[in-house]
Swiss-Prot record, chain B:
Organism the protein comes from: Homo sapiens
GO molecular function per UniProt: GDP binding; GTP binding; GTPase activity
Protein name: GTP-binding protein Di-Ras2
Motif (Effector region): 36-44
InterPro entries per the UniProt record, alphabetical: P-loop_NTPase, Small_GTP-bd, Small_GTPase, Small_GTPase_Ras-type
Binding site for GTP: 14-21, 33-39, 61-65, 121-124, 152-153
Gene coding for it: DIRAS2
Function: Displays low GTPase activity and exists predominantly in the GTP-bound form.
Membrane topology annotation: Lipid-anchor
Reactions catalysed: GTP + H2O = GDP + phosphate + H(+)
Keyword Transferase annotated: no
Chief location of this protein within or outside the cell: membrane
Phosphoserine, modified sites: 35, 126
One GO cellular component, as annotated: plasma membrane
Length: 624, 199
């Protein structure tokens, strides 16, 4: 060997320094300097001490006549043994060792996995095939799927542990940086998820048959734990808030360094915190896939077959439920906004009892005394029906006129002809009859199909209410208040920058119009927002276009195409994205420059810092 | 602006079985598995160059989420670039991309500045082709995105796909190749050679 790489050194010293840093309160400037220096050192030493597993793939041929240099062909895998120098690394390929230019290779990502994971698998298969020729390939596939379920579960647990121990715990120690509320926003209920998954993976391990993995019976595990998975709902619903809060915090370099320190200390892979925070969302979507795969390779005679089948169904339901709740929650912002755009709103907020628009359209209301008929816009939500009057001139402006409580109402389909009570001839009519008060409302549509649609919508409203009762769906008061607040903020900020896309060519039935300023919405009057300008509120009105598809898919597309398109939700997302793109525009080069200038202001440390800067590049290369 | 975790996030979408995982695996690890393709990891990473510096390409796998749009939205909102994969042997898989594209539009707003690549995978199986490339090209034009046919199995166009996608990024210079400072390194090489001899 021409030159041995550095001897192995423990990572304890810099690790301790980091730990101390997280605890102490250095002035931010000094902290930054020390952190970047320590981080670089830590990773470098880690890299060297773990030299045996760092593999790089050659991007180009490296042809050399120098016997101290390592020659290789593009595509060769090189074991990197020393990367202390930025440009020239020491490594081994085949049986040779030598220097090679670092730029000629790229580090293999996912180094934690064996470089060639096909080989051992093939060997396993071969051995088993030799032992028992009869073992069908289906059993082998089942083994594969079971191994995968177990291994992804272990990986996932590790992720969760890393987040809980590496981030949450560290953040808790810094009450000066994070309030308890902020932590709750960023991390949601991830600690509960961690707890549940720990129990789950334990149950899986117990049922795992080590000798003959394909005989493992995992189905029951999923069935036993299916109710626990519902806590993912809260997590998924909170995730957008977490992203907004994170991108807000990471505008401050102190937080960026803190999170980076947490990551390195926990020796986590090179993904930013928001990447880690997305894993539970991804995970809960994957269970149905894995179970479907498992079922595919489970023989109907297998003892686990029925359980796997039931588990697949259960986990699909769980994911669907979570998805549905997420969607509903996205809707409440839209509903809040819709309400705040209605003039002369009276009574309690819509969200107190409702969370979904079921149907809407124009109906003729025939009132009792003089059989007068009025054209009104009706909006059917779960639990209540709101009716509004269109402005005579501005047809897109709506005035609140009243509401009906759907819980006590009976819908009566009326035949065309003379109405006995009102003595008028009616067509396409139905009656909403209130059992307790005896009130009755006669409503007519223009066309018979419209009446059918309304009748179906009323039925659907009842189904929805019942379903929500069964699954225990409700909006918390906090979520409701937040939505109303967002709606009022929306009024202040005015129209979101991006124009509502997707109106073209999409099967969109509810179209949104954003006219110019009109009167100030009533909701805002009642809320205490003295600073609100009355000049720029925004009106949003729904106009119902003719549905073309069959009603069953109607609600699906409504939810997807977002009747209330200009929402706070999307505004918040867009804001987050703008922030994202801003932070990325100033990517490494400028950021590096800034870091150096910042640091060199402390002249004593400047030399060291430039060194650290060099090493930072290595950090990016070497996080494995 | 302080230094940010400079990662570039790519989300890969597509119906089940079109080869999202295979594409990503082929790109990141260079492997392809004929018989059994496991659900890939949640997030892959790859070192790339960005504005002449180094950053992490973060590839988010969305496997499993195509049935759950509200959760898919969470992945979309964090992505910088998108790969929409269908299989050329399944028209249905192309159809299933449409709602995903609409969602991206809805969440991202101005899609023209966002790198989106429509990808027809499995082009090695052209005997059972259901989607002609001309059709997909036309769709890509209406979507104002780029289009490419790939084969993860034959490693055809896989690297090119990611390179093209990064080329579409106009707000910064991102590239798979980390060779921004070659000439400098050339100089450094001379220097280092001297050092090695001394030792």
């Amino acid at each position: 060997m021409a030159r041995a790489p550095q001897p192995r050194r423990g990572a304890a010293a810099p690790g301790n320094a980091l730990r101390a840093l997280l605890r102490c309160n250095l002035p931010p400037g000094a902290q930054r300097v020390v952190v970047s220096a320590v981080l670089a050192l830590l990773v470098l030493i880690n890299l060297i001490s773990d030299g045996s597993v760092v593999c790089a793939e050659a991007l180009w041929d490296h042809v050399t006549m120098d016997d101290q240099e390592l020659g290789f062909k593009a595509g060769d895998v090189i074991e990197v043994m020393d990367a202390t120098n930025r440009a020239w690394w020491w490594g081994r390929a085949a049986d040779c060792e030598g220097w090679f230019p670092a730029s000629f290779v790229r580090l293999r990502v996912n180094q934690d996995e064996p470089a060639d994971d096909e080989a051992p698998r093939a060997r396993d298969g071969g051995a088993e095939a030799g032992g028992a020729e009869a073992q069908s390939s289906k059993d082998q596939m089942r083994t594969n799927v079971i191994n995968e379920i177990l291994s992804t579960e272990r990986d996932y647990i590790k992720h969760l542990r890393d987040i809980c121990e590496g981030y949450v715990r560290q953040c808790r120690k810094r009450a000066d940086m994070f309030s308890e509320e902020q932590l709750r926003t960023i991390f949601g209920n991830i600690e509960d998820i961690y707890r549940c998954q720990k129990a789950f993976v334990k149950a899986l391990e117990q049922r795992f048959n080590r000798e003959r993995p394909h005989l493992s019976e995992l189905g029951a595990c999923f069935l036993e734990h299916q109710a626990d998975f519902q806590i993912y709902s809260e997590y998924c619903n909170n995730h957008p808030n977490a992203c907004v809060e994170l991108s807000r915090l990471t505008k401050l370099s102190k937080y960026v360094y803190f999170f980076e320190a947490c990551r390195l200390l926990q020796k986590m892979i090179d993904i930013s915190l928001d990447g880690f925070l997305l894993t539970p969302v991804q995970k809960i979507c994957k269970y149905p896939l894995q179970l479907a795969e498992l079922l595919k390779y489970t023989h109907p005679q297998h003892r686990d077959f029925k359980d796997v089948e039931a588990a697949l169904h259960a986990m699909k339901n769980v994911a669907q439920l979570i998805n549905e709740r997420k969607r509903r929650l996205e809707n409440i912002d839209k509903i809040a906004q819709w309400q705040s755009a209605i003039e002369d709103w009276e009574g309690e907020d819509l969200l107190v009892r409702s969370s979904e628009l079921i149907y809407s359209g124009e109906l003729t209301r025939v009132t009792q005394p003089q059989a007068k008929s009025q054209q009104r816009m009706f909006f059917l939500f779960d639990h209540q029906l709101i009716y509004c009057k269109k402005d005579l001139l501005r047809r897109d402006v709506l005035y609140y006129k009243g509401r009906l409580d759907m819980d006590g109402l009976e819908v009566v389909d009326l035949e065309d002809g003379k109405d006995r009570d009102l003595h008028v001839s009616i067509k396409n009519a139905f009656r909403l009859h209130c059992g307790t008060t005896g009130d009755s409302h006669l409503l007519c549509t223009r066309k018979p199909e419209q009446k059918q649609r309304w009748l179906k919508a009323f039925a659907r409203e009842r189904e929805q209410v019942q379903l929500d009762q069964e699954t225990g769906f409700s909006i918390t008061e906090l979520q409701r208040k937040q939505a109303m607040l967002n709606a009022s903020k929306q009024q202040v900020t005015g129209k979101p920058k991006a124009k509502p896309p997707g109106l073209r060519g999409t099967p969109c039935r509810l179209k949104l119009f954003v006219p110019k300023a009109v009167g100030r919405p009533c909701y805002l009057m009642r809320q205490k927002h003295p600073a609100l300008p009355s000049s720029r509120p925004q009106q949003q009105v729904l106009v119902l276009a003719e549905p073309r598809r069959k009603p069953s898919t109607f609600w699906h597309s409504i939810s997807r195409l977002a009747p209330f398109r200009n929402t706070q939700e999307s505004a918040a997302l867009q804001k987050a994205q703008r922030e994202d793109s801003q932070m990325h525009r100033s990517c490494p080069v400028r950021a590096t420059a800034k870091l150096v200038t910042m640091d060199t202001s402390n002249s004593q440390l400047s030399g060291e810092v430039k060194g650290a800067q060099l090493l930072r590049v290595v950090i990016l290369f070497s996080n494995v | 602006m302080p230094e940010q975790s400079n990662d570039y996030r790519v989300a890969v979408f597509g119906a089940g079985g079109v080869g999202k995982s295979s594409l990503v695996l082929r790109f990141v690890k260079g492997t392809f598995r004929e018989s059994y393709i496991p659900t890939v990891e949640d997030t892959y990473r790859q070192v790339i160059s960005c504005d002449k510096s180094i950053c992490t390409l973060q590839i988010t796998d969305t496997t499993g989420s195509h049935q759950f749009p509200a959760m898919q939205r969470l992945s979309i909102s964090k992505g910088h670039a998108f790969i929409l994969v269908y299989s050329i042997t399944s028209r249905q898989s192309l159809e299933e991309l449409k709602p995903i594209y609409e969602q991206i539009c809805e969440i991202k707003g101005d899609v023209e500045s966002i790198p989106i690549m429509l990808v027809g995978n499995k082009c090695d199986e052209s005997p059972s082709r259901e989607v002609q490339s001309s059709e997909a090209e036309a769709l890509a034009r209406t979507w104002k995105c780029a289009f490419m046919e790939t084969s993860a199995k034959l490693n055809h166009n896989v690297k090119e796909l990611f390179q093209e996608l990064l080329n579409l990024e106009k707000r910064r210079t991102v590239s798979l190749q980390i060779d921004g400072k070659k000439s400098k390194q050339q100089k450094r090489k001379e220097k280092l050679k001297g050092k090695c001899v001394i030792m």
